[in-house]
Amino acid sequence: MNRIIFCTFFKKKSEGQDFQSYPGKLGKKIYDQISKKAWEKWIEKQTILINEENLNMFNLEHRKKIEKYMKLFLFKK
């Protein structure tokens, strides 16, 4: 069964994600407020950022940087 949520990214009701894709409180917020389509848009943007900035996801500082970009992208904050 599809979950319908109010997506804060698109500012409209949309199909929610099937499962929590990100850990912790931020992951719960994403699961509750970000639609499946918005999350897919973020994954595309994340791939571009990792490649353009030559980020290594084994590096803690690089993961923090991606998380910062993710918050800005998804929540405009």
From Swiss-Prot:
Gene Ontology biological process terms, A to Z: cellular response to oxidative stress
Spans through the membrane: none
SUPFAM superfamilies to which the protein is assigned, alphabetical: YggX-like
Superkingdom assignment: Bacteria
A Pfam family assignment: Iron_traffic
Keywords: Iron
One example GO MF annotation: iron ion binding
Alphabetical list of InterPro entries matching this protein: Fe_traffick_prot_YggX, Fe_traffick_prot_YggX_sf
One Gene Ontology cellular component: cytosol
Family: Belongs to the Fe(2+)-trafficking protein family.
The protein's assembly and partners: Monomer.
Primary role: Could be a mediator in iron transactions between iron acquisition and iron-requiring processes, such as synthesis and/or repair of Fe-S clusters in biosynthetic enzymes.
Name the UniProt record assigns to this protein: Probable Fe(2+)-trafficking protein
Native organism: Buchnera aphidicola subsp. Acyrthosiphon pisum (strain APS) (Acyrthosiphon pisum symbiotic bacterium)
